[in-house]
Swiss-Prot record:
GO terms for molecular function: serine-type endopeptidase activity. The keyword Protease applies. Disulfide bonds: none annotated. PANTHER family: PROLYL ENDOPEPTIDASE-LIKE, PROTEASE FAMILY S9A OLIGOPEPTIDASE. One of its GO terms (biological process) is proteolysis. InterPro entries: AB_hydrolase_fold, Pept_S9A_N, Peptidase_S9_cat, Peptidase_S9A, Serine_Peptidase_S9A. The active site is at S585 (charge relay system), H707 (charge relay system). It comes from Sinorhizobium fredii (strain NBRC 101917 / NGR234). Its EC number is 3.4.21.-. Belongs to the peptidase S9A family. This is Uncharacterized peptidase y4qF. Keywords: Hydrolase, Plasmid, Protease, Serine protease. Residues 733-754 are annotated as: Disordered.
Length: 754
């Protein structure tokens, strides 16, 4: 009884507004550039939760009701405050927007890709928000319009492409669009002979694949409450009828449908929702197959989920290829006869090698090509049908990204390459190398550059990229990919980016406009270096790198970031008061949590659509990604894991006694991954827990668009310019870019880390 009485007194104190509550509830005036500005603070509606004898109060849970007019009023007030608080940066923001928009590459930044008798390609007419899709016969002739997103009602506000999949004969086009930003894609099938849309599926659709008959389409449909695909639907376009042919009942599993690179087989993968290690070729717990020319047939299970392995299947001649993790986390490659691919018939093709991850399998008629990664360096290795190693392609970059094949670029579009060929197209991209598309002929081991993104005004020789190592608390070496101008003065300001979640590898990439590096050139030109810290929890160094920082080891992600920052300062690359950390989504949660542990180490924090409250996400059964988050962070229903989460959860570590660095937070009203009220609650609670330090806190919420941000140029440039102007202001780096000032040759260096 005594314990209950004490707990009740704590609850009464929190609800009634005793001393503890008063300390957190007073609204403060942020000392920014205009001291008369006062940020908004929504009303508090305290709700008590008692879990594992821990009493917490959620004062701003009511913000989740987006239909409440007070919610929108508060969000609009935050946007207004953000504009006023950064009013002194308007000229800088305008300058940055002009720089970013001026780097839009010329046409032809991506080569066309072939499907059947046609080459498909994009054309971007200036003045229109979205590129238009065309096609031209492979044999030559005039181009014809296939898809103009600018003509879709609502696309002028927001438009995101999900899939773009033409049938092999060129009759039909399956494409999907998101016109809100919530990542729920509507499927449409267009008859390209007359331009009519002959089918629509308003449900949330993912992958699509055509059967060999060119009128049967298979696609995945999403489970509404879990945001994962659980159904495979077969559509007969000619008849206009559809039926569910496979449904996964286990909500911890999802399904995916695809076609083998040979074109002969369809594969149905059953995936664990917690496995996000690769967006391109994810391992499956179970695999089914169906001949592509028998779309009405019965699917055959070739990998049993009872095996407990992760497997990716491909087809090559009379055998199936399996990338499997049975021998270790870096994968090995085996083959098996099509009629009996059971494990007893597996024959090893490539053994498991510690430290060498087999990321992807690609097959040509006479060549097997593997995309491997050792450390941060990817490579392509070919083998002929007898298993002899042929070409080995290793880009001359310290760390970079290789993408194999060509696709339409939609989030569910599959990259493709011709099977009956000895040539394979791939792209290389890094901090200093814009996307460069290369065709390699494995018959004669020769390469030719097809095209490269030409960024106006960009001179790659002015920048230098490198990789340095930092020693973590436990002695592990953590890599940091860095880029800076060659003539940058060291030490200097640095923007460090981090993700560190779900085993997703984040490697340097330039990407074509509009993208992060084309925008970040404006930072580099103002002598702010940029880097990615490859902390544990990510997948850059393979699955063990991820597994080392999950659940009750998750704080290793944060301590790795701290060690990397300290290492750059000790090496004389970064100034002690000149490091800004940034992260997006799960990475946003990473930087917010890390700032709790070492607030004085960082000049400022940028948290885009951050996972700011892990505990409440896990406890809310209506949240779409709860199961995935549990596998990564732990289950707060377990007392031990709850206490561990409580030790670093950004929201629950806000207090009046803790000062935090200046922070920029953004969110999106229609975000389907990190629901807007997570960042909003964090900001409101942090404002209410102001300390004497009064750290500057800016919060912007996009009323249009979702997790990935605006969908076309002006919005993307404005968002990037606002964020970078804020970062430059925190670093006091208002210096103009080098085109407007003389640079001393005496400052030139060959190594950005001295």
């Amino acid at each position: 009884m005594g314990g209950l009485s004490a707990m009740q007194r704590r609850i009464d104190l929190l609800v009634e507004g005793g001393d503890e509550y008063d300390a957190c509830s007073h609204f403060r005036s942020v000392v920014m550039w205009d001291k008369s500005l006062r940020p908004p603070l929504p009303r508090a509606e305290p709700r008590i939760r008692v879990l594992h004898d821990d009493v917490t109060v959620d004062r701003y849970g009511w913000l989740r009701d987006r239909e409440n007019p007070d919610v929108r009023a508060y969000l609009e007030a935050e946007n207004s405050y953000a504009e006023q608080a950064t009013a002194h940066l308007r000229r800088l923001k305008t300058e940055l927007i002009a720089e970013i928009e001026g780097r839009q590459p010329c046409e032809g930044a991506t080569p066309p890709f072939q499907v059947g008798p046609f080459d498909y390609f994009q054309g971007h007419e200036r003045g229109l928000p979205h590129p238009v899709w065309w096609r031209r016969p492979v044999t030559g002739g005039s181009a014809e319009l296939v898809l103009d997103p600018n003509a879709i009602p609502g696309a002028d506000v927001f438009y995101w492409l999900g899939v773009f999949e033409p049938s092999d004969d060129g009759r039909y086009l399956a494409f999907s669009v998101d016109l809100i930003g919530a990542e729920r894609y509507e499927l449409r099938v267009r008859d390209m002979s007359d331009g009519r849309d002959v089918w629509r599926d308003a449900g949330s659709v993912g992958q699509v694949v055509w059967a060999a008959d060119n009128h049967t389409l298979f696609f995945t449909r999403e489970r509404p409450d879990r945001r994962q695909h659980h159904q495979i639907v077969r559509l007969n376009v000619g008849r206009g009828n559809s039926e569910v042919v496979f449904e996964e009942a286990n909500e911890r599993l999802a399904v995916l449908v695809r076609r083998s690179q040979s074109g002969a087989w369809l594969f149905l993968d059953v995936l664990t929702t917690s496995d996000m290690s690769s967006y391109v070729q994810r391992g499956a717990a179970e695999v089914w197959c169906l001949p592509a020319d028998e779309p009405g047939g019965q699917w055959r299970r070739i990998v049993m989920r009872e095996l407990g392995h992760q497997i990716y299947a491909e087809h090559w001649y009379d055998r199936f290829l399996f990338r499997v993790d049975d021998a270790g986390p870096y994968w090995r490659l085996v083959s098996a006869p099509i009629d009996d691919p059971s494990p007893s018939r597996w024959e090893e093709v490539v053994p498991h090698r510690a430290g060498v991850t087999i990321d992807e399998i690609h097959v040509l008629e006479q060549h097997l090509v593997l995309l491997e990664r050792e450390g941060l360096r990817p490579r392509l290795i070919s083998r002929n049908r007898s298993g002899r190693v042929g070409a080995v392609i290793v880009p001359d970059e310290p760390s970079c990204t290789i993408r194999v094949g060509l696709s339409a670029g939609g989030c569910y579009s599959a990259a493709r390459h011709p099977f009956r060929s000895s040539k394979l197209t791939y792209s290389v991209s890094s901090f200093v190398t814009p996307d460069t598309f290369i065709e390699h002929d494995f018959a004669n081991d020769r390469s030719v550059v097809l095209c490269e993104a030409r960024v106006p005004g960009y001179d790659a020789t002015q920048y230098l990229a490198t990789v340095v190592m930092a020693e973590a608390e436990d002695g592990v070496q953590v890599p940091i990919s860095l880029v800076a101008r060659r003539d940058r003065t060291s030490p200097g300001p640095v923007l460090l980016s981090v993700y560190g979640c779900y085993g997703i590898p984040r490697l340097p990439s330039f990407l074509a406009w509009p993208s992060s590096m084309t925008a970040r050139l404006s930072l580099l030109d103002r002598e702010v270096a940029f880097g990615i810290v490859h902390v544990r929890g990510g997948g850059e160094l393979g699955r063990p790198w991820h597994d080392a920082a999950t659940r009750d080891q998750k704080r290793i992600t944060h301590t790795d970031l701290i060690s990397a920052t300290e290492g750059l300062i000790e090496r004389g690359f970064a100034t002690r008061d000149g490091v800004v950390i940034e992260g997006k989504s799960g990475g946003g949660g990473t930087v917010l949590a890390t700032a709790v542990f070492r607030p004085n180490l960082f000049r400022a924090v940028v948290a885009e659509v951050p996972l700011a409250d892990i505990i409440d996400t896990q406890l809310d059964s209506t949240m779409p990604y709860t199961l995935k988050e549990t596998a990564e962070y732990g289950d707060p229903q377990d007392a031990y894991e709850y206490r561990y989460l409580r030790s670093y959860d950004p929201y629950y570590n806000l207090s009046p006694e803790r000062s935090l660095p200046p922070t920029y937070v953004d969110a999106a009203l229609d975000d389907g991954q990190v629901i807007y009220y997570q960042p909003a609650r964090y900001v409101a609670q942090r404002r209410s827990c102001a300390t004497d330090r009064d750290p500057d806190l800016v919060f912007r919420i996009r009323m249009v668009g979702g997790h990935s941000g605006p969908s076309h140029g002006p919005g993307i440039a404005e968002q990037a310019a606002f964020r970078m102007a804020w970062v430059l202001d925190q670093l006091r780096s208002h210096a103009p870019p080098p085109s407007r000032k003389a640079r001393s040759a005496a400052r030139r260096s060959t190594d950005p880390v001295r």
